[in-house]
UniProtKB/Swiss-Prot annotation:
InterPro entries assigned: UPF0216
Organism of provenance: Methanopyrus kandleri (strain AV19 / DSM 6324 / JCM 9639 / NBRC 100938)
UniProt-recorded name of the protein: UPF0216 protein MK1676
Segments traversing the membrane: none
Lineage per the UniProt record: Archaea, Methanobacteriati, Methanobacteriota, Methanomada group, Methanopyri
Recorded family membership: Belongs to the UPF0216 family.
Length: 147
């Protein structure tokens, strides 16, 4: 295991700063549908509100038993490779349905090109958010530190 360089540490710190708009805790579709004004609290203390029509469309796409598993907002992970990644079984299922892609039961990750990302964001602007990933910073997987 090699030590991270100063540049790597700086870049990771900046990416974490850029991601302040992300929620402290994502909520399930089930939780959000019960709220009068569906929202999550972001890391920077602001609130991100969801459009109820988007939530209803997601509820129509996804079988009811998965409403408690779909975590929102769906995070569109942007990383070093230039591709976007969506993670999570329920999240991937929704994205595949929206994009007309084949979905497999065991699938918990999907890579998207930027045209697909644009379509997804146009369909669900409040139910999706960009996340800048540190996982493949500088073209290599992030090293997990154990303390």
């Amino acid at each position: 295991m090699r030590d991270e360089s100063r540049l790597d540490k700086y870049v990771i710190k900046e990416i974490l700063r850029i991601n302040r708009h992300l929620p402290r805790r994502r909520k399930t579709l089930e939780e959000l549908l019960r709220e009068e004004r569906p929202h999550v609290v972001n890391r920077d203390g602001t609130k991100h509100y969801f459009d109820r029509d988007e939530l209803e469309r997601l509820a129509d796409i996804l079988p009811r038993y998965l409403h408690g598993r779909l975590k929102l907002p769906i995070l569109i992970e942007l990383g070093y490779s230039g591709a976007a990644v969506i993670r999570g079984k329920a999240e991937v299922r929704v994205v595949c349905e929206v994009l007309g892609e084949e979905w497999r039961f065991s699938q918990d990750r999907v890579e998207l090109n930027m045209l697909d990302v644009r379509k997804l964001r146009r369909e669900f602007p409040t139910a999706t958010q960009y996340m800048f990933s540190t996982e493949y910073i500088m073209g290599r997987p992030k090293v997990e530190r154990r303390g």
